[in-house]
Amino acid sequence: MKQSALFEADDVEAISIDDVAFSLNVSSASVRNWIKTGYLHKATKNSVTAESFVAFKDEILGTEKLNQRANKSLKDQHDHSGLEEMIHNIIRSNEVHPEGLSDIYEESLSESYKNKEGVFYTPKEIAADFFDYLPKDCSELTFCDPCCGTGNFLIEAVKRGFKPCNIYGYDIDEVALEISRSRLKELCGVAESNIEKRDFLSASYQIEQKYDVIFTNPPWGKKLPKKDKDSLADSLATGNSKDTSAIFFFASMKILNSSGYLGFLLQDAFFNIASYESVRKAALANQIVALIDFGKPFKGLLTKAKGIILRKQCPDDQHATICVSGNTKNEVSQRVFEKNPKSIFNFTCSELDLEVVEHILSIPHKTLRGSARWGLGIVTGNNKKFCLPEARGGYIPVYKGSDITRKG
């Protein structure tokens, strides 16, 4: 094992992909796959943020299973035109119920396609959960899913009382849109014209209509040309939050009616990584109705999925956010998140934990910013296997955290 270099405090924002690969003893391709799936977050073309690396190392890496899979190639054979033809033929033949057609299409997408496009379709039960936080009577409200895919949010909107003529869906995948239309026609008995092929980010400036409810699952980590991403981020004033999902958030807020509801299903990083600070602060300027931890609902994707539902309305000092994690549900003052460093949404903590953190942060204190050097420790991925109690050829002596005491 070889210890990686120390980084000066001013350099800790980013770590090169090659350094991460060396530290974790995997290939650069594996690191890039982890970037695609949302575990690590790009700082530049060839580096990741130090914060996401530390979080990945501490919270995700460490199981031998993950390391065994690290260099395993993703399924990369994907004939989308052939898949399109198959789906069109099935629709024309009426051989499969539209609900089943949705499942067939989603399961036919290769892992490489999903990762490239950031496509992980919302499970039906999760889509249903979002609607539990809306008013009971939605009959006069308008609904939009700007990344509607095969239509799980759209179908649930009909079931919850939205009129079909008030439901709008956009996507760039014509096959997914055709499935959405088929499902809505099967459910409502009429074909609606509000389901359109449209690149929502490019078209958001041209959409004059505003909506009362916008629920969506935006692409996770989809790559946009840097020029397009920077242009969108600047025009939408996204601050330091330039990930695709953050840009979708600001674009959606732009077409949401005052007092309207916005619900996003997002990767775990959105709620706690520094690069999303700007979008979290934008969310905190509104009433955050609920924060929900859905665990790991996507097959083949280890990152957690979490939901945020907010109302486009200024919060008062007494506003409480419903926080759901597993079987636990409690209400937490929204102000707690405003006081957190980087406005982190640590909503899966218990009420007592949140009170302790708030108390600690309220005490006058100093930080190590500008006064310390930051270094990467040795990352084995499996300490039980690679950290030995006796000397052996090719190994070097190291200190564990527990070896360091106040006396040295």
Curated annotation (Swiss-Prot):
Cited InterPro entries: DNA_methylase_A-5 (IPR003356), DNA_methylase_N6_adenine_CS (IPR002052), N4_N6_ade-DNA_methylase (IPR050953), SAM-dependent_MTases_sf (IPR029063)
Record-listed E.C. numbers: 2.1.1.72
Top-level division of the source organism's lineage: Bacteria
Keywords: DNA-binding, Methyltransferase, Restriction system, S-adenosyl-L-methionine, Transferase
GO molecular function: DNA binding; N-methyltransferase activity; site-specific DNA-methyltransferase (adenine-specific) activity
Role this protein plays: A gamma subtype methylase, recognizes the double-stranded sequence 5'-ATTAAT-3', methylates A-5 on both strands, and protects the DNA from cleavage by the VspI endonuclease.
PANTHER family to which the protein is assigned, alphabetical: DNA METHYLTRANSFERASE A (PTHR33841:SF1), DNA METHYLTRANSFERASE YEEA-RELATED (PTHR33841)
Protein name per its UniProtKB record: Type II methyltransferase M.VspI
Species annotation: Vibrio sp. (strain 343)
Encoding gene, per UniProt annotation: vspIM
